[in-house]
Amino acid sequence: MSPRVLILGLGHWGQTLAYLFEQRGCTVSSWGRSQGALSAALFQDIHLLVSALPIKAVREVAAQVTRLHPPLGIILVSATKGLESETFATAADIWQTYCPHHDLVVLSGPNLASEIQQGLPAAAVVGGNLAATKQVQDCLGSPTFRLYSNEDRRGVEMGGIFKNVIAIACGVNDGLGLGVNARSALITRGLVEMVRVGTHWGGQVETFYGLSGLGDLLATCTSALSRNYQVGWHLAQGKSLSQALALTKGTAEGVNTARVLCTYAQQHQLDIPITAMVNAVLCGSLTPQAALHCLLERPFKPEVIPGQ
């Protein structure tokens, strides 16, 4: 019998994951919030439960899932890249709270959905215990979608979360016509901020230099296909945040993530200047040009590479 997969979330990424599982011969069912409440029948005989929901919907849906008592053999796969505003919780944190006895893995990497749907090659990381990640690799991995495993679930998840903010910065850079040199500096120094916060959150340094960290950062910060990049680009063109979001198809998680990360960094005295400037632009307290000026006026300092 082919593996049965239930995907929660009917957005672009959820649809792309459904396509990938179907390509591997899995039997796939999909559910979206517009379809009403979940039912126990959806969980019958499934092997993988994949969450591709926006972060703001995860807690509500996870609460529904746990009330239906899904069988313990189901592996939960979190494919959400965001932080909950009130709690600093990641999507995996939320699923762990509501389904503590299920195996839980995180799927993340440089995966622009539209390229994958065209059949173009890509790679990603499954973070979690190796027995569970192996099952996901077997169900989802293919010659055009290469899956690696990593036991550092926290690091895999944090890389995918943080890169969205830096992608907004790079969209602003390109929208202002500031060139490749400046964008390269933003990506590199953004990686430093990712490692600084991600390791404080419990991730391992090495993970952030892999596919789910640096890899995702490069893809998202250099492609107009990225929703977060698009938001930054529209802001640089003089659009308001509401206008930028209206022009961007789908959820740009980096908008909320920037604010949450700034609050977290302030509480824990972590220096994340690029993220802070992105948040200031999103809040409307600085123009993109003024934010850039603030970054360039920072005192000179030694280049510190986390992990060295």
From Swiss-Prot:
Pathway: Membrane lipid metabolism; glycerophospholipid metabolism. Its main location: cytoplasm. Signal peptide: none annotated. The active site is at K163. Sn-glycerol 3-phosphate binds at K81, G109, K163, D216, S226, R227, N228. The keyword Lipid biosynthesis applies. It is found in: Cytoplasm. InterPro entries: 6-PGluconate_DH-like_C_sf, 6PGD_dom2, G3P_DH_NAD-dep, G3P_DH_NAD-dep_C, G3P_DH_NAD-dep_N, NAD(P)-bd_dom_sf. One of its GO terms (biological process) is phospholipid biosynthetic process. Pfam families: NAD_Gly3P_dh_C (PF07479), NAD_Gly3P_dh_N (PF01210). Its EC number is 1.1.1.94. One of its GO terms (cellular component) is cytosol. It catalyses: sn-glycerol 3-phosphate + NAD(+) = dihydroxyacetone phosphate + NADH + H(+); sn-glycerol 3-phosphate + NADP(+) = dihydroxyacetone phosphate + NADPH + H(+). One of its GO terms (molecular function) is glycerol-3-phosphate dehydrogenase [NAD(P)+] activity. NADPH binds at W13, R33, K81, A113, R227, E253. Catalyzes the reduction of the glycolytic intermediate dihydroxyacetone phosphate (DHAP) to sn-glycerol 3-phosphate (G3P), the key precursor for phospholipid synthesis. This is Glycerol-3-phosphate dehydrogenase [NAD(P)+].
